[in-house]
A protein has these predicted regions:
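Short glycine/acidic-rich loop motifs that flank beta-strands on beta-rich extracellular proteins
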Residues: 36-39, 52-53, 57-61, 75, ...
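Glycine-centered, small-residue-biased loops immediately flanking beta-strands
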Residues: 27
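Right-handed parallel beta-helix/beta-solenoid
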Residues: 1-22, 33, 47, 361-362
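Hydrophobic "rung" positions of tandem beta-strand repeat architectures
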Residues: 110, 119, 142, 169, ...
Length: 362
């Protein structure tokens, strides 16, 4: 299919949505280069492959969905609803012309709701509101959500996600399993608006976050520990357990990797330049922090709050304190870590819980 004046062999449609509506489950749709000024609704199994130069740039993005968790209105450029085996590859999804004039409906680039599939080699960009609305908790690149006893199993791979207002990638709610890997997720840098999170798995969702590059999520009013009211993160696990975070590179944020849950595994990550708090923060029980490299933490490089966690064989560099192990917890195993240019290797302060200062996307 094509809307480009240059001939595209075999093209039968000028709108992607017309091709979707006509297709049978399991069909493949090839999208030729061109600019497609439309929203998409995908409610059947399809394989959508876009050529280089295929841009989905809706002329406006009105509400077309409702959040299963909050009941909020959602305005999504691409809405995958109740479908399985959906593949979207190679498409650039651009929200620059969204036209939204308030905090509602919430703006999302690609929204999987009770659906399964893969988003690969996509670019998702410019999901932001106007400057006067920069504090709205809106503007997420990719959002995966389950509800009503249904499930979503989604892979997000090899994508470029940037110029979002709230989160780059979010996967939420029980029934959701997200495999998020080999993406580049870049925040907008210091902002007084919505506190950003690069990648989030939350609210009983499960999954793995691996081999991503996530940087530049900074809430600029948060400058020192004692006065900071809100924090931005590069990777956030919010009230979810058993999430694996491995081999990512994260940098430039208040907290690099924030685990607010239990039984997480953090292995082989490189985290740097946590400007106020830590490169790795664990709030929960039974997590394993192993073989990570952390550099230049603000307060410390690693913060540990909970029981029966292990911090083993990490390389910890350039911070006032290497590991902050909060008082009042038992069973933690801290051994075989290497410390470089660290004032104090391990210190046991009082609890400084940040759960109420992080702002998850939901």
């Amino acid at each position: 299919m094509s809307n480009n004046p240059t001939p595209c062999p075999g093209a039968q449609f000028t709108l992607i949505q017309d091709a979707i509506n006509t297709a049978s489950p399991g069909d493949e749709i090839d999208v030729c280069n061109g600019i497609y000024a439309e929203q998409l609704l995908i409610n059947k199994s399809l394989d959508i492959n876009a050529d280089f130069g295929a841009f989905l740039v809706p002329a406006s993005i009105p509400q077309n969905a409702t959040s299963l968790a909050t009941g909020d209105g959602i305005a999504a450029a691409v809405f995958v609803s109740g479908a399985t085996n959906v593949s979207i590859s190679g498409l650039t999804v651009d929200g620059i012309n969204n036209g939204i004039t308030g905090c509602a409906p919430r703006l999302i680039g690609v929204y999987f709701q009770n659906s399964s599939g893969i988003l690969r080699h996509a670019a998702v960009r410019n999901f932001r509101l106007g400057t006067a609305l920069n504090a709205c908790q809106s503007g997420t690149g990719v959002f995966v959500e389950s509800g009503g006893g249904q499930s979503s199993d989604v892979e997000i791979a090899d994508c470029s996600i940037h110029d979002f207002q709230k989160n780059g990638i979010t996967a939420n709610e029980s029934g959701t399993n997200a495999k998020i890997h080999n993406n580049v997720v870049t925040g907008i840098g210091p902002t007084t608006g919505a506190a950003q999170n690069g990648i989030q798995i939350g609210f009983s969702a499960e999954g793995a976050i691996r081999e991503n590059i996530v940087t530049n999520n900074v809430w600029s009013p948060c400058m020192v520990v004692v006065t900071c009211q809100t924090v931005a993160t590069n990777i956030l696990v919010a009230l979810s357990d058993n999430v694996r975070v491995s081999d990512n590179t994260v940098g430039i944020s208040q907290v690099g990797i924030f685990i607010d849950g239990n039984d997480a595994e953090l292995r082989g990550n490189t985290a740097f330049s946590a400007s106020v708090f830590e490169n790795i923060r664990i709030q929960g029980n039974g997590s394993r922090v192993q073989e990570n490299k952390v550099f230049n933490g603000g307060e410390a490089d690693i913060y540990l709050e909970g029981n029966n966690n292990s911090v083993v064989r990490n390389s910890i560099s350039e911070a006032p304190i290497g590991i902050l192990e909060a008082q009042g917890f038992t069973g933690n195993h801290i051994t075989a870590n290497a410390f470089f240019n660290v004032g104090v290797t391990i210190q046991d302060p009082g609890v400084n819980n940040l759960s109420k200062r992080v702002v998850p996307d939901r």
